[in-house]
């Protein structure tokens, strides 16, 4: 499986052990080994080379497991002169350990600044010889056929390098040398990273950098300062509430007539008479036309108010003469109990049988028997029930129906 450089775990150089630890070159281990071999004690040494070799073959950080890629059949140890830690980047190792390790096979492909500047490389500058860098960028292996060693990099020909010979999809010859102080820079980069010409008289397209406002950053000055009252008058005259101003919805504009011409010309007349301060008064000619109610409408309104003096009665209970339809149709309870009423002649109820009137009834009033009274002998409506409760009254109503 091939990993991209961005998906690999990249450990910072400050936290790596560089160069990687090698027990064979460790002076402490060598001193202990020499002491154990030269000691008088005939017993087994504390740390034997065979034990260290077996430990290195099994669990050392320099050990390369064989299960990383299927094409790698046998495990192999890294060479002692290899300065790349396999714990940070476990990638393909060459099957033949006698071959010199190349950067491409070592699986560290993304540090490609230049051959003369080794900053950022994972290997020492001694490995960056001419043939190594050409092999790194051109893709031609110095060992001949590398088909048995698949590389994690698909192609290195597009990587920029001054030492590459055939990589020319990227050309950096036109850029100015920013590290050379002897050359005067003819091009400069603006804030967006775009090269622009540097001139003392000309300014860049960023006026806020120099602190000098330009015309593009400011709005156009207003010719006339309108007051709030002037704006309200213009809106009220130029845009009537009953006429829609937008014609996009299919509304046909009103045909200009003699009455509409005064309204259309009102804003222009107002603008001529008003000063910028907006303190000039309105004249009679410039006042908007407001339709006044006609005399016939006033007469109708007055007549309607006279016909409804109280305004509390509904259309169902109000007679044409303005009085209730049920006026004096029920006896006054206060008059029946005490014989007096505080309302007097203004009372809406009848004070005696002389004033009692028959209320307007439905034509079928008391013409049928009450079902609840016939079945149960009781009716919740009582005397107000519109149906018959007495048999005598029922017989009378039946005879009245048969007589015509």
UniProtKB/Swiss-Prot annotation:
Taxonomically, which superkingdom? Eukaryota
Compositional bias annotation for Low complexity: 150-168, 304-317
**Which of UniProt's keywords are assigned here?**
Cell cycle, Cell division, Cytoplasm, Metal-binding, Nucleus, Repeat, RNA-binding, Zinc, Zinc-finger
Q: Which GO terms describe its biological process?
A: cell division; negative regulation of conjugation with cellular fusion; nuclear-transcribed mRNA catabolic process; positive regulation of conjugation with cellular fusion; positive regulation of nuclear-transcribed mRNA poly(A) tail shortening; regulation of cell cycle switching, mitotic to meiotic cell cycle
Q: Which cellular component, as a GO term, is one annotated location?
A: nucleus
Gene3D superfamilies assigned = 6.10.250.3220, Zinc finger, CCCH-type
Q: What is this protein called?
A: Zinc finger protein zfs1
- Species whose genome carries this gene: Schizosaccharomyces pombe (strain 972 / ATCC 24843)
What is the taxonomic lineage of the source species? Eukaryota, Fungi, Dikarya, Ascomycota, Taphrinomycotina
